[in-house]
């Protein structure tokens, strides 16, 4: 695949950084770009991490401003004063309606202009937080929609879709970057450097790491 190019939807978190490093290994650094979205997220430190990691890995990064989302939707992920809770339907109030649909749309528009067909997203439905737009059925339908909308053969890849968080840590270890992911990425919804250990994202991350390290010791 060295003659093909890929665009990674990149937040600076554990999953997207794992995907970015994997893409570099598959396609070659010179063939990989990252696209990052500023949408008013309360964990803005994530954006700082994304910029640093992209620069450190030598990957071109494009940052798009989608903060207009604040004008049309409200959720705990974009409101510093809101408590993070889970609704009766099981969906946390950190869910941003339409976020991944918008991310994929804008990523596709950018990718086509760059002659890129491969779009990579770190979404996962195994150990996910109950977000409907992290499901494989959504991504596949979006892939078809974008191909039809732009008459272009996009291929959306979700390498973590069926991996547990423990398996995602294992993948990072296999690529030789477990410590890098552990020390350099940011996942906390509350924007606390090093993690708050209380929000759903921190809990998933820490639980997965503990499970992986425990299984590694048992081998």
From Swiss-Prot:
It is an enzyme of class 6 (ligase). The keyword Ligase applies. Binds 1 zinc ion per subunit. InterPro entries: QueC, Rossmann-like_a/b/a_fold. The keyword Cell wall biogenesis/degradation does not apply. Pathway: Purine metabolism; 7-cyano-7-deazaguanine biosynthesis. Zn(2+) binds at residues 188, 196, 199, 202. ATP binds at residues 10-20. Keywords: ATP-binding, Ligase, Metal-binding, Nucleotide-binding, Queuosine biosynthesis, Zinc. Its cofactor is Zn(2+). It catalyses: 7-carboxy-7-deazaguanine + NH4(+) + ATP = 7-cyano-7-deazaguanine + ADP + phosphate + H2O + H(+). It comes from the Bacteria. Its EC number is 6.3.4.20. One of its GO terms (molecular function) is ATP binding. GO terms for biological process: queuosine biosynthetic process. Catalyzes the ATP-dependent conversion of 7-carboxy-7-deazaguanine (CDG) to 7-cyano-7-deazaguanine (preQ(0)). HAMAP family: QueC (MF_01633). Belongs to the QueC family. This is 7-cyano-7-deazaguanine synthase.
